[in-house]
Amino acid sequence: MNLIVTDIERITVRAPMTPRCEEWNAREVWQWCICEIIRLTTDAGIVGYGETLPHYTWGRVSDEAIARVKGQNAADFLGDDTLCAGLHMAIYDVVGKALNVPAYRLFIMPK
């Protein structure tokens, strides 16, 4: 399977919260409302999405991670825990779509 990554877009959003959650977040973890959405496109036209809370997980997707993945086969990065969570999820999403299986099934597939 050849899924060459042609584009990776980072979209940062501030998710609205209920007043109760806003109050709690203001005291504890105010940055939990900030999300980074990753949109990964392949040469086959398949688009995969991933998301992360950059202040809670591994952080924002770095320029270095994008440069490492862009132009490469997305399937080669399955199981690569050095990528940030959002990019890793987008890779699983795009490979799952290419194989016509839910992304979670990729965790139990033989290599």
Predicted regions and their residues:
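Metal- or metallocofactor-binding catalytic centers and their adjacent structured scaffolds
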Residues: D7-I8, L40-P110
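Structured beta-strand/loop patches that form or line metal/cofactor-binding pockets in enzymes
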Residues: M1-Y49, L53
